[in-house]
Amino acid sequence: MLALSLLALGLLAEVAPASCQQGLGNLQPWMQGLIAVAVFLVLVAIAFAVNHFWCQEEQEPGSTMMITGNKADGVLVGMDGRYSSMASGFRSSEHKNAFENVLEEEGRVRSTPM
């Protein structure tokens, strides 16, 4: 078996290399650069799309909008009695338009080191 593999290796070493690829001509350097930039931008767009769909976070049930019973209490035009349920969690008891500063849970806070 060793002799057969050595014979095949020797034959492959003696055979002249094949030149199978004959191009129609070399592209101009500016055309090569343009093609390289286009391919790079396509790859970046694909990476952004994959990142967007792959790393998409599920919406928390507490962050959805809820409808209240009284439409006359609507604050914003176009909201028609809707409010964010997140705002009701830290609304102040002292004044109806004041809010408390609530500490966030450690796992939910995103921060970047400087």
UniProtKB/Swiss-Prot annotation:
Subcellular location: Apical cell membrane
CC annotations in GO: apical plasma membrane
Bilayer disposition of the protein: Single-pass membrane protein
Alphabetized InterPro entries for the sequence: PDZK1IP1/SMIM24 (IPR031627)
Extracellular side: 1-28
Assigned keywords, A-Z: Cell membrane, Membrane, Phosphoprotein, Transmembrane, Transmembrane helix
Modified residues (Phosphoserine): 85
Ranges annotated as spanning the membrane: 29-51
This protein's record includes keyword rRNA processing: no
Highest taxon of the lineage: Eukaryota
Residues exposed to the Cytoplasmic side: 52-114
Principal location class: membrane
Family matches, as PANTHER family: MEMBRANE-ASSOCIATED PROTEIN MAP17 (PTHR15296), PDZK1-INTERACTING PROTEIN 1 (PTHR15296:SF0)
Function: Auxiliary protein of electrogenic Na(+)-coupled sugar symporter Slc5a2/Sglt1 and SLC5A1/SGLT1. Essential for the transporter activity of SLC5A2/SGLT2 but not SLC5A1/SGLT1.
Family listed: Belongs to the PDZK1-interacting protein 1/SMIM24 family.
Quaternary structure note: Forms a heterodimer (via N-terminal transmembrane helix) with SLC5A2/SGLT2 (via TM13); this interaction enhances SLC5A2 transporter activity. Interacts with PDZK1.
Protein name, entry field: PDZK1-interacting protein 1
Organism: Rattus norvegicus (Rat)
Record lineage: Eukaryota, Metazoa, Chordata, Craniata, Vertebrata
